[in-house]
């Protein structure tokens, strides 16, 4: 089949896709190994951020809905809390019925999800968990055109499914 379409570049396209998928698989495997080896939540969050930086991104962040995780005192995880009420307008506007959003956020939206972030051009944002109700994971780029609608989200999806189990080592679910 590939030979029949080689004149049209299908063979080359399929090979490029296979190579790209293999690269994504190994990146995810490395991330999972690294996060599993973390000795604390802070260590895990630092490893996650460093992994994103190694990919050339500005960073990676997690925000959790406090009605799904025990984030209040005496825990020192309150900085991860994201008010569902504050997030809902952004979710409706940017995600709609989707689990992922890739593209820019405006100033007020950034203040909701990344209040301490500086120079964010675009984000890859995904709802956490299989029911998309645990919080949000965000990857940031300084480049406004780095993340755009229509880009693949498979790696983002797998990370959003993997993180809740790892987080549950340090934060109790409600």
Please report, for each region that a protein language model flagged, where it lies by residue.
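Regulatory loop-to-helix N-cap segments in sensory/regulatory domains
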Residues: 141-157, 167-174
């Amino acid at each position: 089949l590939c030979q029949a379409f080689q004149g049209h570049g299908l063979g080359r396209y399929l090979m490029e896709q296979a190579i790209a998928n293999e690269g994504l698989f190994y990146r995810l495997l490395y991330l999972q190994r690294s996060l599993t080896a973390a000795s604390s939540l802070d260590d895990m969050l630092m490893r996650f951020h460093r992994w994103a930086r190694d990919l050339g991104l500005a960073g990676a962040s997690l925000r959790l809905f406090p009605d799904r995780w025990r984030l209040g005192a005496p825990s020192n995880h309150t900085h991860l809390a994201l008010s569902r009420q504050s997030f809902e307008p952004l979710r409706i506007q940017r995600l709609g019925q989707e689990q992922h959003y890739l593209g820019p956020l405006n100033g007020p939206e950034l203040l909701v999800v990344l209040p301490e972030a500086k120079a964010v051009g675009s984000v890859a944002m995904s709802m956490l968990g299989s029911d998309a109700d645990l919080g949000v994971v965000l990857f940031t780029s300084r480049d406004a055109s780095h993340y755009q609608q229509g880009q693949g989200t498979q790696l983002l999806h797998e990370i959003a499914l993997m993180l809740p189990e790892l987080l549950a080592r340090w934060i109790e679910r409600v």
